[in-house]
Amino acid sequence: MPSGKPSSVFPLHPKPTPLKPSSSTSSSNNNSTNQACAACKYQRRKCAPDCLLAPYFPHDRHRQFLNAHKLFGVSNITKIIKSLTPPEKDAAMHTIMFQSDARANDPVDGCYGIIKKLQYQIEYTRNELEIVLQQLAMFRDRAHQHHHQEPHIQMQEQEDLSSFSSSCDLNNNNSIPYNYPLNHIQEPNQQQYCSSGNNFSGLQEDMWCLQLQDSSTIVNMKAGFIDECEDVKPVEEVSSERHEFEPHEAFVEQRKLDLPSAQYIISS
């Protein structure tokens, strides 16, 4: 007996539900999403499929929309981009967002502050480039002058060497010959000795005479004199007065015996 229960009342496997479109789809599918753009959310209205501000102010750019709305206003922005082509619309919206963000960061200067900073950087870089170019020109001039002065310097050095060699030749010609008798030139010490020795001229004549005799005779005479005279006066007691030469044999012998004392006096 067939049962009267329908088979479709309690299905064994439920049917899959369709997926909702994601938020990254085109603007035509934005109305099917639960999140509206930042402009529509601020105005508390439903985001239309042809919303002009939805591509530029999505729901996660609420702060940027507030900056643009505070500076320009939603109605003015819509009027600006309404009659523009898509490339021009993108450029206009990029400019509006940049200017509004700059005003929010710097309420006094805004974009003008950024322009001043860029102009200062340009001027500083231009001055630095000018200084570098001046230094390069200076170094090039120095290198050019040095390159042209090298032959002149070499010629001047050769002239100096030739003049120096000629002056040396003249000095050598005017100098004393190597075979000139040097004994004719008296040194100052020798001249002083000759002048001071005039007081002992008589004694020097006797010394030269005594040096010509035999040394053995002098030794023998000295020994005999020591035997005869035991008390010999020291050298300091010898009188420095000059005695006149007396050609007497006994006096000559006495002067011969006084040879050591005379040599000591002259050496002192």
Curated annotation (Swiss-Prot):
Pfam families: LOB. Residues 35-136 form the LOB domain. This is LOB domain-containing protein 22. Residues 22-31 have a biased composition (Low complexity). Belongs to the LOB domain-containing protein family. It comes from Arabidopsis thaliana (Mouse-ear cress). Coiled coil: none annotated. InterPro entries: LOB (IPR004883).
